[in-house]
Amino acid sequence: MVDSIIVLSGGMDSAVLLAQTLKEGKTAQAISFDYGSKHNDRELPMAVGLCEEFAIKHQIIKLPFIGELFSSSLLTGGEEIPDGAYGQENMKSTVVPFRNGIMLAIAAGYAESVQAGEVLLGSHSGDHHIYPDCRPEFNNAFAEAVNLGTDGQVAIRFPFSEMTKRDIGDLGRTLDLDFAKTWTCYKGGELHCGVCAACDERKEALRHPEGLDVTKYLV
């Protein structure tokens, strides 16, 4: 039996969520998904490393059908990842159809199986503009569906839903989280590219202009 199942991508948001959950004294396991994204090969090792550091059980679930059947520039074989800010129309190409719904459903089933009372996802207020399955309306409806579908045994929670990514970065710093052990860049190169929307957001969140960001960028 465990308190929480954390959906851990290996990115900064879910890493902070993991650290904060453990600081609260909860027991936790992490679940990650290999769904064929261009940055899975960079993110997943970060997730593995975080779980080893925090000494928690970690499951990686392979979802090859997403890469095979779905269309998104975020997926291997998709069009090129666009540069620019999240607010731009072209960033909608990075939406992976119903990704969070699929992952949360699996996490909820796993949580019920191991008698964990909650599933935690690190989506934040800045995700809402582009990604339909990060919006409060979706989160609330899906949480209710899981509550009904598990007969009240599993709650889906979004602790950072009212926070900005910068808020999350600041919280992680108070937790002494090493952000060099997290991955954000959508392009999945050896280093963070520094120009895609995800990198732009990371730079702002980690206060790069103030010299507080430990990330190594190409640009």
UniProtKB/Swiss-Prot annotation:
Domain of life: Bacteria
InterPro entries from the UniProt entry: QueC (IPR018317), Rossmann-like_a/b/a_fold (IPR014729)
Catalytic activities: 7-carboxy-7-deazaguanine + NH4(+) + ATP = 7-cyano-7-deazaguanine + ADP + phosphate + H2O + H(+)
Gene3D superfamilies with a match to the protein in the record: HUPs
Catalytic activity, EC: 6.3.4.20
Pathway involvement of the protein, from the record: Purine metabolism; 7-cyano-7-deazaguanine biosynthesis
Cofactor note: Binds 1 zinc ion per subunit.
Cofactor dependence: Zn(2+)
Binding site for ATP: L8, S9, G10, G11, M12, D13, S14, A15, V16, L17, L18
Pfam families, alphabetized: QueC
Entry-linked SUPFAM superfamilies: Adenine nucleotide alpha hydrolases-like
Keyword flag Oxidoreductase: no
Family under the similarity heading: Belongs to the QueC family.
Protein name: 7-cyano-7-deazaguanine synthase
Organism: Desulfotalea psychrophila (strain LSv54 / DSM 12343)
Gene that this polypeptide is encoded by: queC
